[in-house]
C-alpha cells in the first residue's frame, strides 16, 4: 500500500489514493541543558516523566538520552528510537519529543551519533555494521534493562530526521525488535537496507529544497519495489524542518490512532 497525502497546520487531506525532533540541520538552536544521569523530573506543563542520560558511550564520548513517561512501570509502552540531524544531540531530541511522549504514552530513546559533528555512519553492504549501529543497539539494550520498563512489542519505531533519516531503515531492516521506521526529510541508501520489511513512514515539506517532494516520491517507489508492503508518504506545509503537526501525525500513524 502506498499513500501520498498533503498536510496543513491543522489537518491532512489525500492527494493520491512510509522522533527526535531531530535537532540539527533543521531549525533547532544549540541548547546546553544539564540532564542528570540519576534522572530529572519534569514538572513543566504537568509533565512528570523522567529523563536519563544513557550510560553507553561512543569512542568519542558521546552518549544520548531517553524519556520515560509518567506511570511507565504500570504497563508495556511503545518505544520510539529517534535519530537527530546534523549537529544534533539526543538530549535536544528528547526536549523536542517529551511533551508528545507524555501525552501519547510512549518511551523515547535518542542516541547521540559517534561523530562530534552530529552526522551518522551507515553500512554500504548488507553485512556492514558501523559503530553508530552498535551504539544505538547498546542504548536500546540499556533502556530495556531499566527496572519497570516493558515495551509494547507490536509498536517499536525507528525514526530519523534529515541525515538521521538514513539510520532508521539501516537498523530497522536488520533488527526484528522494530515494527516500523520513519524517514522525515531524510534519504535512504539502497545498499543500507537489510532483509526485514517493517511498515514505512516517509514525510517532507512542500517547501523543502533539501529533500524535495519529488525525491521522497522516488524513495517511496523504490521501497515499494523492494517489497515493503506498507509505505506511507505525507507532505506538510513546511520547509526542511519539523512542526508539531508532522510529529503528531507520525505518532498517530505509528500507534494506529489516525
What name fits each language-model region?
Residues 6, 13, 17-79, 159, ...:
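A domain-start/cap signature at the N-terminus of enzymes
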Residues 49-68, 78-149:
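Serine-hydrolase catalytic machinery in alpha/beta-hydrolase-like enzymes
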Residues 78, 198-199:
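Alpha/beta-hydrolase fold active-site loops
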Residues 81-83, 184, 236:
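Alpha/beta-hydrolase
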Residues 84-86, 144, 161-163, 168, ...:
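Cell-envelope and extracellular/periplasmic
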Residues 91-97, 184-193, 214, 218:
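Alpha-helical scaffolding within the catalytic cores
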Residues 154-196:
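Primarily recognizes the serine-hydrolase "nucleophile elbow" in alpha/beta-hydrolase
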Residues 201-203, 213-258:
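C-terminal catalytic histidine-bearing segment of alpha/beta-hydrolase fold enzymes
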Amino acid at each position: 500500500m502506498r499513500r501520498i497525502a498533503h498536510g496543513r497546520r491543522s489537518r491532512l487531506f489525500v492527494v493520491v489514493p512510509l522522533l527526535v525532533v531531530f535537532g540539527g540541520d533543521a531549525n533547532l538552536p544549540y541548547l546546553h541543558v544539564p540532564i542528570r544521569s540519576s534522572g530529572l523530573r519534569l514538572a513543566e506543563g504537568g509533565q512528570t516523566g523522567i529523563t536519563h542520560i544513557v550510560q553507553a558511550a561512543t569512542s568519542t564520548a558521546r552518549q544520548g538520552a531517553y524519556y520515560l513517561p509518567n506511570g511507565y512501570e504500570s504497563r508495556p509502552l511503545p518505544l520510539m528510537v529517534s535519530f537527530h540531524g546534523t549537529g544534533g544531540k539526543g538530549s535536544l531530541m528528547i526536549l523536542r519529543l517529551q511533551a508528545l511522549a507524555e501525552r501519547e504514552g510512549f518511551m523515547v530513546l535518542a542516541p547521540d551519533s559517534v561523530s562530534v559533528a552530529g552526522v551518522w555512519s551507515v553500512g554500504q553492504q548488507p553485512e556492514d555494521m558501523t559503530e553508530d549501529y552498535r551504539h544505538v543497539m547498546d542504548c536500546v539494550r540499556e533502556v530495556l534493562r531499566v527496572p519497570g520498563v516493558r515495551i509494547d512489542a507490536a509498536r517499536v519505531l525507528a525514526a530519523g530526521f534529515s541525515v538521521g533519516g538514513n539510520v532508521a531503515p539501516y537498523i530497522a531492516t536488520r533488527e526484528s525488535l522494530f515494527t516500523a521506521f520513519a524517514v522525515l526529510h531524510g534519504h535512504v541508501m539502497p545498499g543500507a537496507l537489510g532483509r526485514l520489511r517493517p511498515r514505512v513512514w516517509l514525510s517532507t515539506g512542500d517547501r523543502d529544497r533539501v529533500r524535495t517532494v519529488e525525491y521522497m516520491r522516488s524513495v517511496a517507489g523504490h521501497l515499494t519495489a523492494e517489497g515493503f508492503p506498507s509505505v506511507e508518504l505525507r507532505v506538510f506545509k513546511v520547509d526542511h524542518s519539523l512542526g508539531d503537526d508532522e510529529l503528531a501525525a507520525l505518532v498517530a500513524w505509528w500507534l494506529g490512532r489516525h
